[in-house]
Amino acid sequence: ENVIFPGYIRGEIIEGAYSGADLFFFPSYEETEGIVVLEALACKTQILLRDIPAFDPWMQDRVNCYKGKTNQDFIDYINKIINHELPSTIEEGYKVAKERDLLLIGKQLKEVYEKVESL
């Protein structure tokens, strides 16, 4: 009764969903980039991830997120996060989202293409 599975969410509603959440829990075993993680970070939501290589080194446990490996880790972290027993990593997480902003990454990619093109 304390968990909501809303399905696919579009547009401005997604920002409200992330922002209104106590926690963004992403226990995926496999991931390529983690766009949903970046969305949650950009909305200043506390993050709990599975500790998998896809999030290294940009997501750092106890710095800009929390990471767990086992179900018991997740249970412990969820309880501590929702009861405010752990320091917030939200502001550091938000910095990660800003560093990976699409406009910034697009500009960097353009510069790389232009450099390669000039060779």
Role assignments for model-derived ranges:
Residues M59-Q72, N79-E85:
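Conserved acidic donor-binding segment of nucleotide-sugar-dependent glycosyltransferases
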Residues Q46-L49:
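Short hydrophobic beta-strand element within catalytic cores of glycosyltransferases
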Residues Y8-I9, G16-A21:
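Short alpha-helical donor nucleotide-sugar binding micro-motif in glycosyltransferases
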Residues P87-K115:
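A charged, aromatic-enriched C-terminal amphipathic alpha-helix characteristic of glycosyltransferases
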Residues E1-I9:
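Nucleotide-activated donor-binding/catalytic signature segment of Leloir-type glycosyltransferases, i.e.
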Residues Y29:
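Aromatic "clamp/platform" in nucleotide-sugar-dependent glycosyltransferases that forms part
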Residues E15, E33, L38-A42, P53-P57:
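Short alpha-helical segment that forms part of, or immediately flanks, the ligand-binding pocket
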